């Protein structure tokens, strides 16, 4: 199972994130979407998570990827 970051209402996915400039690029081709590790998302319902992009983090003993800040983006499982 892959984890992608998808627009809540459109068929577009995050393709890449440039952390230096803050630019996020999107694609409508699911095969070009950035895939994230699924361990952090394993216990979450995709509709409850809002996303910006993912970056490594460690908090409260959990290691994984942190997502936040753009409500129209959601975690999407394939």
Where are these regions (language model features)?
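Feature targets compositionally biased, intrinsically disordered low-complexity regions
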Residues: 1, 21, 59-63
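Short aromatic-glycine-(Arg/Gly/Cys) micro-motifs in beta-strand/loop hairpins
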Residues: 2-29
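Short, mixed-charge low-complexity intrinsically disordered segments
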Residues: 34-78
